[in-house]
Amino acid sequence: MENHGGPTSTAKGLLAIAEDVDSDWFGVNLDTGNFHSDDVYAELAAVAPHAINVQVKVVVSGPDKVKHPTDFARLAAILNAVNYRGYIVLEYEEAGDPRTESHAYLEKLRAAFA
């Protein structure tokens, strides 16, 4: 299940569902750009133990929808703290040329997880 609107738009709502599913085959596709609270990183940390895949967007935003660069080092610390061992996917949805911009962000992401 992905944190993508509706009842999954907050960590509390997503966890209410995720923790009710009693199956080793169920997990969260954690999208770093889909929480829009006052503390996006706290929400990511709350859900991280349930993550089986992580889609890293290059920006995060709060309730005001103002975009801020994703703090890759902070994200890496959150995922390392829960011993995350799944895939990490870079998802670039910004205005620049993805072929050019994605490479630079991928290098930053690799450095954060090194």
Place the predicted regions along the sequence by residue.
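Histidine-acidic metal/acid-base catalytic patches
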Residues: 7-114
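Short, well-ordered beta-to-alpha junction loops that form the rim of enzyme active sites
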Residues: 2-4
